[in-house]
A protein has these predicted regions:
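N-terminal intrinsically disordered, low-complexity, charge/repeat-rich segments that act as generic
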Residues: 4, 101, 107, 116-129
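Short acidic-glycine-tyrosine-enriched beta hairpin
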Residues: 107-122, 229-244
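Ligand-binding loop in jelly-roll beta-barrel domains
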Residues: 109, 122-148, 244-270
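Surface-exposed interaction/gating patches
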Residues: 157-215, 219-225, 231-232
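A short, N-terminal "cap"/entry segment at the start of jelly-roll beta-barrel domains
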Residues: 2-67, 133, 142-191, 275-278
């Protein structure tokens, strides 16, 4: 497996001499948040956290993508929280893109490196801390877990993408693969957070149009991505946010790999009332 890279924003502030024209856009079907707009002045903070800031790149939004939130969290040395989550119904995935994250999950300590992935079920006891002298940056994806009578809660686990063999899509000669952290047939899970990998020349050869909402954070490389009726150039550090049924396709022209972290909601009946809880 090729050595992977993981883009992480560092903030900063543009000079007064820079042009304000950028690729940022928000439409009725999708949004593109390019890396150039993730600056210091748009960060947020949370109660019970020390030495942290975060970029909120997705949140439940009525009439758009409604099922998940996604943060990019930056921890300064000694930053973290002993009480990171206040919602007892929230499940989460943590994915480390820079530095080292010390995760204490149900009493067990894990030193998570870049590529590190943790699934945290609702109600789980956990703490996060940056115990190093360098900055740590990670994605925190949260969803209200949809319980089903007779289906147990999924178990917590911690792994690293380097320990998982990507599954190659058929008839692609290895140019399109997916690193899956959860078995697709495991009905305990109502969301998947995967990594999609394209080698140069790899494509999504049709306009995917489906019910699953998406958050796509580009970890590495660049490509041209079709969103609804638009072809958009994207690169490492960009985020694409798609509502249900937004058509999408991709062409990865190189010169290197194109990879993104992908959220989608799965394995549950569709709600039949608009204001029912997710």
């Amino acid at each position: 497996m090729s050595k992977s890279s993981y883009y992480a924003p560092h903030g900063g502030h543009p000079a007064q001499t820079e042009l304000l024209t950028d690729r940022a856009m928000f439409t009725e079907a999708y949004a593109v948040i390019p890396k150039g707009v993730m600056r210091d002045i748009v960060t947020s903070h949370l109660p019970f956290w020390d030495n942290m800031r975060m970029w909120v790149i997705a949140r439940p939004l009525s009439g758009f993508a409604e099922t998940f939130s996604q943060y990019i969290v930056e921890l300064a040395p000694n930053g973290g929280s002993d009480k990171p989550e206040q919602d007892p119904n929230a499940e989460a995935v943590l994915f480390v893109v820079e530095g080292e994250l010390s995760l204490t999950l149900q009493g067990q300590v894990h030193a998570m490196q870049p590529g590190g992935y943790a699934f945290i079920p609702p109600g789980a006891d956990y703490k996060v801390r940056n115990t190093t002298g360098q900055y740590t940056r990670f994605h925190w994806i949260r969803k209200h877990y949809q319980k089903v009578d007779g289906v147990p809660l999924p178990e917590a686990f911690v792994t690293n993408e380097q320990d998982i063999q990507p599954l190659v899509m058929p008839d692609t000669e290895g140019r399109w693969s997916t690193t899956r952290f959860v078995d697709m047939s495991d009905m305990r899970h109502d969301m998947h957070v995967n990594i999609v990998n394209f080698e140069p020349g790899g494509v999504i050869p049709f306009a995917e149009t489906h019910v699953m909402e998406h958050g796509l954070y580009v970890l590495e490389g660049k490509a041209v991505y079709r969103l609804n009726q638009d072809w958009v150039e994207v690169e490492a550090g960009d985020f694409m946010w798609l509502r249900a049924f937004c058509p999408q396709a991709c062409y990865s022209g190189g010169p290197g790999r194109f990879r993104y972290l992908l959220y989608k909601d799965v394995n549950r009946h569709m709600r039949l009332t608009l204001n029912a809880p997710h």
